[in-house]
A protein has these predicted regions:
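N-terminal leader/linker segments that initiate helical-solenoid repeat arrays
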Residues: 20-67, 76
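Helix-start (N-cap) detector for alpha-helical repeat units in TPR-like alpha-solenoids
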Residues: 27-28, 61-64, 98-99, 132-133, ...
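Register position in tetratricopeptide repeats
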Residues: 39-40, 73-76, 110-111, 144-145, ...
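Canonical positions in the second alpha-helix
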Residues: 53, 89-90, 123-124, 157-158, ...
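Structural marker of alpha-solenoid helical repeat scaffolds
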Residues: 56-59, 93, 127, 161, ...
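Canonical tetratricopeptide repeat
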Residues: 65-69, 103, 137, 171, ...
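Terminal, low-structured helical/coil segments at or just beyond the last alpha-helical repeat
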Residues: 239-276
Length: 276
């Protein structure tokens, strides 16, 4: 997936004093080439030309942005250690950059370092109190850590900033589901599905879980079926369908779905734990 890095490269171009300077500068020529490689998702070559640009002008004032782009290119290659080091370096140069903090936080999420992601998102919310995405993730991590009051505060701020944002809808749905308010959660998930051009299997999965909790089995079946059409190898969906079949007292169908869940990566013990 091409991440939002081209725009930052263009920002660097705009800061050049003139087109003649850019044409004569190896630094900007390397950046030009890196941008072309990024558009083609040739991450290895993009990394090479960004490194050449940094070597050409190691003291250039734009390098914090360029180093951030280098980190993102490395992240796309799953070079997580190098990427993290370069986000750290870029932030040492521009510690109050919201973009850099969000990029590093996103990487921390990707490598499941939730505490570090939480701290970066918290820094962003202090720098920009209207940043919806960061407040959403800050609240979501708080919820996962059991900090219900923090999550409620974050998600309440989302309602204040933009009650119609998909982040707000998903935040409220997740909160209500966690609190056991399944009817309310279903309403928020339904709003979110209406907002999505193509409903994600993840949203359908979550709403199906809520339907199962209140034993609306036909509705749960519909969501599970639609989710499986989008993600047929998602093991947990077969666990949900096994649970549905258990509630319908269909042990043969339940066992079939347990076997499918095992096939796609969930152990039998884990499947039975979720079905109970």
């Amino acid at each position: 997936m091409i991440r939002k890095i081209t725009g930052l490269l263009l920002l660097i171009f705009a800061m050049a004093s003139s087109s003649m300077v850019r044409a004569q500068s190896a630094y900007y020529n390397y950046i030009d080439t890196a941008e072309m490689k990024i558009k083609k998702q040739n991450w290895l070559q993009a990394e090479r030309y960004i490194l050449m640009a940094l070597k050409a002008e190691p003291a250039n004032k734009n390098n914090s942005l360029l180093i951030s782009n280098l980190a993102t290119v490395q992240r796309n290659q799953k070079k997580y250690i190098e990427a993290l080091k370069n986000y750290d370096l870029a932030l040492a140069m521009t510690p109050k950059s919201v973009t850099l903090l969000k990029n590093r936080a996103s990487l921390y999420l990707e490598i499941d370092s939730l505490s570090h992601a939480y701290m970066d998102y918290e820094k962003v919310t202090l720098l920009d109190r209207e940043d919806i995405e960061s407040r959403y993730y800050h609240g979501l991590i708080a919820l996962r850590k059991g900090q219900i009051d923090v999550a409620k505060a974050d998600f309440g701020d989302l309602l204040r900033i933009n009650p119609y944002s998909p982040y707000t809808k998903e935040a409220q749905a997740t909160l209500q589901k966690t609190l056991g308010n399944y009817e309310e959660a279903i309403e928020y998930y339904s709003d979110l599905i209406k907002m999505q051009e193509t409903p994600s299997y993840h949203t359908l999965l979550n709403r199906a879980e809520c339907y199962l909790e209140i034993e609306k089995l036909n509705e749960a079946e519909t969501d599970i079926r639609h989710a499986l059409a989008k993600a047929p190898s998602e093991a947990y969906l077969y666990v949900l369908r096994a649970r549905l079949n258990k509630l319908r007292r269909l042990p043969g169908d339940m066992e079939r779905d347990i076997q499918l869940a095992i096939k796609y990566g969930i152990s039998r013990e884990m499947a039975l734990f979720f079905i109970k």
